Amino acid sequence: MGPCSGSRLGPPEAESPSQPPKRRKKRYLRHDKPPYTYLAMIALVIQAAPSRRLKLAQIIRQVQAVFPFFREDYEGWKDSIRHNLSSNRCFRKVPKDPAKPQAKGNFWAVDVSLIPAEALRLQNTALCRRWQNGGARGAFAKDLGPYVLHGRPYRPPSPPPPPSEGFSIKSLLGGSGEGAPWPGLAPQSSPVPAGTGNSGEEAVPTPPLPSSERPLWPLCPLPGPTRVEGETVQGGAIGPSTLSPEPRAWPLHLLQGTAVPGGRSSGGHRASLWGQLPTSYLPIYTPNVVMPLAPPPTSCPQCPSTSPAYWGVAPETRGPPGLLCDLDALFQGVPPNKSIYDVWVSHPRDLAAPGPGWLLSWCSL
C-alpha cells in the first residue's frame, strides 16, 4: 500500500492570524462607585433636563458626566440602566412618534410621585461603611430627594487633587537640598582655598561654621587626581591617586568628620539625617561612604586607628599585639543599618588611593 496522499510529515501549521487578540484586563477601581441606586441616578439626570425627558443614549451620557466612575472601561452598568428603565413603574416611555410606539429612539420621563423615598438616599455600600469607620465626610450627598423632587441643581463631587510628586526618601528628609533645606540654618559659605587667585593678592579664608549650623545638603567638588603639595594627614603625605574619579559634586557632610575646628567635641551636635541612612537610600550614586560617629566608650584608647572616627585610611602602626582591642569592642560603634562593606572616612582626601606605607584599618573590605 502506498502512503496516504493526505498525510504530511512536517511541523504543524501556525495558528490562523484571524483570531481576535486577547482583551486587556479592565481596571474598575479608579473612582468611587456612587452609593446610589440606578433609579435615583436616572431620575436625577432626567429631572435636570430642560424638557424633563431624555433618550436612552442621552441618559447614559448624562450619568457619565455627573459620576466619573462610569467613564471607565466598565460597560455592564449600561445594561443596568436599561433594566431599571423597563422594570420600575416610575419611568414611562414617551414615544417620539405616536403612530409608531414600537420604534426605537423614544424618550423616557419620570413620575416623581412613584419614587420610594428610601431609593433616593445613600445605600449601605462599602464606601459608606468606610466613611463611617474612618470618621470622614463623604463627597456625595446623603439624599438626592431635594435634587429630584424639587429641582435643585446637583453639583458632582470634585475629585481629590493628584499628588505633586511621588514618594521618595528625599521628600521626607526635606527636599533636594537646594536653598535652605533645614529651618533656621543659614547656607554655608564656600571656603576659599589658599594659594588661589592672583599672586599679588592674599587669599582670606572663610571661617567654617559649626556643625550645628551647617545646611543639610551642601555640595562640594571631589578632589581631582592631581597631588596636593604640602598637605599632610596624620603626619604622612598623600600620594598621587590613580583611582580618583572625575571631579563631581558630592555631599560635603557625608565626607567630613564630626570634629569641629578648635578642639571642641561634636558629641552634642545633631547627626545629619542623610548620614543616618544606608548608602542604598542616598538620592545620588555614591560609594559606600558613611558619616563617622564619635568614638564609643568601649573603643581602645591606646590604639586610635581602630576607633570608628579613624576608620578608613590609617597609618600603619607597629606595636605589641596586646594593644589591639577585641572585635566585639571594635564593632560596637557600628550602626545596625551599615553593612560590612561600608567605609568610615574622616576627610574628603581619604577617598584617594593610599600611598606607600598606608593600609586600610578595616581588613574585611
Swiss-Prot record:
Motif, SMAD interaction motif (SIM): chain positions: 327-348
Protein localization: Nucleus
UniProt keyword terms in alphabetical order: Activator, DNA-binding, Nucleus, Transcription, Transcription regulation
Predominant cellular place of this UniProt entry's protein: nucleus
One cellular component (GO) term of this entry: transcription regulator complex
Protein name in UniProt: Forkhead box protein H1
Pro residues bias: start-end ranges: 154-164
Disordered: annotated span: 1-29, 151-215
Top-rank taxon, per record: Eukaryota
